[in-house]
Regions:
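Signature of alpha-helical transmembrane segments in polytopic membrane proteins
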Residues: 1-150, 240, 247, 371
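Flexible, Lys/Arg-rich cytosolic regulatory linkers and terminal tails that connect or flank
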Residues: 2-7, 231-294, 406
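Strand-loop microenvironment adjacent to phosphate/nucleotide-handling motifs in alpha/beta enzyme folds
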Residues: 21, 280, 285-289, 441-457, ...
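A solvent-exposed beta-alpha-beta segment
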Residues: 45-49, 139-255, 328-332, 339, ...
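Proline-aspartate-enriched helix->loop->beta-strand connector
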Residues: 211, 215-217, 317-318, 363, ...
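Conserved Rossmann-fold NAD(P)-dependent oxidoreductase catalytic core, especially the SDR/UDP-sugar
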Residues: 241, 256-257, 373, 377-436, ...
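N-terminal Rossmann/SDR dinucleotide-binding element
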Residues: 258-271, 275-367
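Hydrophobic/aromatic anchor residues within beta-strands of the central parallel beta-sheet
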Residues: 348, 390, 450-453
């Protein structure tokens, strides 16, 4: 396909990050002002210029004030495929106000300008600054429509409150794929009102009738606090109608400018139907913990490890060392991070935590302030079949990391544990319990600070049931559940990662931090919601019970009764009272495990882990 020059320009600017776009438009704007003052002078006075320095001063002042004003309005990185008429008006007022302010200052010291000259300068500057932005918007819109992506779909918006108003604020621009036909709201009394010129047609109870009448193809939910049962009801109605259902992006991402409410709509996901509200934690003390520091993450290519890297990057550390055994996953997260965040030195390191000498060499070379230990084998049935690998990675590997932290004098280590470490009947949980003992044991004798963070299942991680259910649904079913009674605690990947980072900030003396994760979720209910999300019914995608697998528990626990204490470091985060064992005793036990294999090793690790779970 032959590309035009405009296509290449659009592609080039689209790959720029926010700071680069600011520089791009800043350079263009100052050139526009320079050209404007030259043209204004030629038109007003002819070609003779008696005082060029004065005009340089005036242009510099005008540009400075203009940048301050559009920066205040958040337009200094404006690429106009998202611009609205109000943005163009702000640019006009910015040029006018900055020009008059500069004129007032210059007139007091350099009374060379007439007000008519300034008026001409304002008109030319505004024209030259707005012209490329408007042209950009028109070209981008034309390309979208020409590609076939710009086909407008007849759409209902659900929500006539604050969320709906935020959606409408950015809905009207040329790249929108929507033809917004009407708005529905839970409150039927709003019927007949208008929001952004679009009528409220009724309650979303009327969705089936109204969708057929208006030939609706898409529904977008713009109620941030919508109850999960209401989400399910809307989804069920949409599925019966054959209508696609989406949601508006999170309000905070819209306010921060990360998404456009009226265009960046998203698929409804399982977190919306589970109704678990993500815990928002106080980040005030994290700056001192992370900013300007070197941070090392083991297992940086995994679901949790990579998200820890993203979360830590928000606090502008000097360097993040991405340590992992899988070169492909480290490669992917490395390139994602350098694309998203600037000014941080990302160092990809391929290393195995079972290789102590390599770990120590990396730790001594980069001298991290904190090590987040996310590397582990986490799949319960796989570890039941491979107990030796679980021992080598989860126990020996954690020991190596903790020992290297001590030897390299790293100030702090945060280890990720699991609720499966509580009364573990399986190898994976037992090895993570022993890993907790290793961390608390090193904390007793080392100058470094160690802690562990214990939480439940993570939605969407590579080891969770979500990808399995998605694959089974895509294949036409059935969806397999081991036991319809089975329950698990769930949290999102970002939430789990935030907990890990906060635990590091509060760690003082070998604590095991435990999150209050709310109510457990039935895996059977989770499967039903996944089928609903796919647009199918249980008659189309059956859910079958296949029996519990080796090492699985019906119900997970976050802590045993003897571990529960009232010590709450912050909302929803507790410190568990856990048993501590001298490191010498742990060393002896690890040497014993090294000589065992197969079922003998499995039973020995599980027995030892359960002996040490209860506080004496």
């Amino acid at each position: 396909m032959n590309k035009k020059l405009t296509d290449y320009v659009i592609d080039l600017v689209e790959i720029l990050n926010k700071q680069q776009k600011q520089v791009f438009w800043g350079i263009f704007d100052i050139l526009s002002m320079v050209v404007s003052i030259i043209v204004s002078y030629i038109l007003f006075y002819g070609l003779i210029n008696p005082a060029p320095v004065d005009y340089i001063i005036y242009t510099s002042l005008a540009f400075l004030f203009y940048q301050l004003m559009i920066g205040f309005w958040g337009l200094n990185a404006s690429i106009s495929r998202y611009s609205k008429i109000t943005d163009f008006m702000k640019i006009f007022f910015g040029v006018t106000a900055s020009s008059i302010l500069s004129y007032s200052i210059c007139y007091a010291f350099l009374p060379l300008f007439s007000i008519r000259f300034i008026f001409l300068f304002i008109l030319l500057s505004t024209f030259l600054i707005l012209l490329p932005r408007i042209t950009w918007q028109l070209i981008y819109s034309k390309r979208k429509k020409g590609s076939g992506d710009g086909e407008h779909r007849r759409t209902f918006l659900i929500g006539a409150g604050d969320g709906g108003a935020l959606f409408m604020d950015s809905y009207q621009h040329p790249t929108s794929e929507l033809e917004l036909v009407g708005i529905l709201d839970k409150d039927s009394k709003k019927k007949g009102q208008k929001l952004g010129g679009i009528p409220v047609l009724g309650s979303y109870d009327d969705l089936p009738e109204l969708a057929k009448r208006h030939q609706i193809e898409r529904v977008i939910v713009a109620i941030p606090s919508l109850d999960p049962s209401e989400y399910e009801r809307i989804l069920q109605m949409c599925n019966k109608l054959g209508v696609k259902c989406y949601k508006m992006p999170k309000v905070e991402t819209v306010v921060q400018g990360l998404h456009q409410a009226g265009t960046g709509f998203q698929k409804i996901d399982i977190t919306d139907l589970l109704g678990r509200q993500e815990i928002r934690l106080d980040e005030s003390r994290l700056g001192a913990e992370l900013t300007g520091k070197t941070i090392l993450v083991t297992g940086a290519g995994g679901s949790i490890g990579s998200e820890i890297c993203r979360q830590v990057s928000r606090f502008n550390p000097e360097r993040i060392v991405l340590l992992g055994h899988g070169e492909n996953s480290i490669y992917l997260v490395y390139h994602e991070l350098i694309r998203k965040f600037q000014g941080i030195d990302y160092v990809p390191v391929i290393a195995d935590i079972q290789d102590y000498d390599r770990l120590l060499q990396v730790f001594e070379q980069y001298k991290p302030a904190i090590v987040y230990h996310a590397a582990a084998h986490k799949h319960v049935p796989m570890m039941e079949r491979n107990p030796k690998e679980a021992f080598k990675n989860n126990i020996r590997g954690t020991y190596n990391v903790a020992k290297a932290v001590d030897e390299a004098k790293v100030p702090k280590m945060v280890m990720i544990s699991t609720d499966k470490a509580v009364n573990p009947p399986n190898v994976m949980g037992a090895t993570k319990r022993v890993a907790e003992l290793i961390v608390t044991g090193f904390n007793q004798r080392s100058q470094s600070t160690y802690c562990a963070v214990r939480f439940g299942n993570v939605l969407g991680s590579r080891g969770s049931v979500i990808p399995v259910f998605e694959r089974q649904i895509a294949e036409g079913g059935p969806v397999t559940v081991t036991d319809f009674r089975m329950t698990r605690y769930f949290m999102t990947i970002p939430e789990a990662s935030r907990l890990v980072i906060h635990a590091g900030a509060y760690a003082k003396d070998g604590e095991v931090f435990i999150l209050d994760m709310g109510k457990p979720v039935k895996i059977y209910d989770l499967a039903k919601k996944m089928v609903l999300l796919s647009g199918h019914t249980e008659s189309e995608i059956p859910i079958v019970e296949v029996g519990i697998r080796p090492g699985e528990k019906l119900y997970e626990e976050l802590l045993v009764s003897t571990e529960l204490v009232d010590n709450q470091v912050m909302d929803k985060i507790f410190v568990g009272k856990v048993n501590v064992m001298p490191l010498e005793a742990i060393d002896k036990k690890i040497e014993e495990f090294r000589t065992l294999s197969g079922d003998e090793l499995k039973q020995a690790i599980i027995a030892f882990a359960n002996q040490t779970t209860h506080v004496e």
